[in-house]
């Protein structure tokens, strides 16, 4: 395990995690359900000098074996920037983000076992030699899920958009609007295979209130969706961001499911 950040009011957490979900099923493996909140341990990481992503992946293979041996398996996800907000004047200050995902209790038990286990100490030292990370805790909740696609596709793309609730609006207002959007998405997903809210809980004081995560199977689906937005769908985004939430603007990450518990 490594290190990260996030915090939010219990009120906002309860409301955003009480939204109905439109899904083809329920199980996403590893104890994760698309119809209930799940725990997320996020590591925002920068490779140390001279280290590569190959070094990172070789360590993860050891980590998967360790979690299986100690009965604390979690889903492991890696994201790297694809269409980021970075440029030459404001470069990205991280190389990748890793997510350990599962039921909240299991993610916590993985941490406890990691911290107490003697056989994890060598692996911990090897990890710290490869990358420097900030560790944060969050909760995820699906609003729309194509279970078959999410369980089958390991390499996909995730659009992030960080938002704050607009002054004068309550979390219940967003809950109602999100439910309406999810209902429309169920009828016509336009290439989207998943939509969830990401709620920082520990270590995220510098982050907005929540993030929308929209999952696509490939870049073609991403840009097909953007074509629809360019042809008039932008009005829906404008209305949402005018009435309900003030958002930073979307970016795209390439996501790979590195490990699914058996």
Regions found by a protein language model. Name each.
Residues 7-17:
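Bacterial N-terminal signal peptides
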Residues 1-4:
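Positively charged n-region of N-terminal signal peptides that target proteins for export
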Residues 22-262:
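Short S/T/G/P-rich N-terminal loop/turn motif that feeds into the first structured element of a domain
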């Amino acid at each position: 395990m490594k290190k990260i950040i996030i915090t939010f009011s219990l009120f906002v957490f309860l409301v955003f995690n009480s939204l109905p979900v439109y899904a083809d099923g329920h199980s996403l493996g590893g104890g994760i359900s698309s119809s209930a909140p799940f725990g997320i341990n996020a590591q925002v990481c920068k490779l140390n000098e001279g280290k590569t992503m190959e070094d990172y992946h070789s360590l993860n293979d050891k980590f998967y074996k360790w979690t299986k041996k100690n009965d604390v398996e979690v889903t492991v996800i890696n994201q790297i920037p694809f269409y980021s907000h970075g440029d030459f004047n404001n470069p990205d200050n991280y190389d990748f983000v890793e997510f350990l995902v599962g039921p909240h209790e299991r993610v916590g038990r993985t941490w406890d076992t990691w911290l107490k286990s003697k056989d994890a100490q060598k692996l911990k030292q090897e990890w710290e030699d490869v990358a420097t990370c900030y560790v944060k805790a969050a909760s995820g909740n699906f609003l729309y899920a194509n279970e078959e696609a999410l369980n089958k596709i390991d390499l996909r793309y995730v659009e992030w958009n960080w938002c704050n609730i607009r002054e004068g609006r309550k979390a219940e207002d967003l809950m109602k609007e999100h439910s309406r959007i999810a209902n429309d998405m169920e009828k016509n997903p336009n290439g989207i295979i998943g939509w969830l809210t990401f709620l920082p809980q520990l270590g995220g004081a510098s982050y907005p209130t929540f993030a929308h995560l929209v999952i696509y199977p490939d870049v073609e689906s991403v840009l097909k969706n953007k074509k629809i937005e360019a042809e008039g769908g932008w009005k829906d985004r404008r209305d949402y961001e005018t009435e309900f939430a003030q958002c930073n603007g979307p970016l795209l990450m390439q996501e790979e499911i590195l490990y699914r518990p058996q």
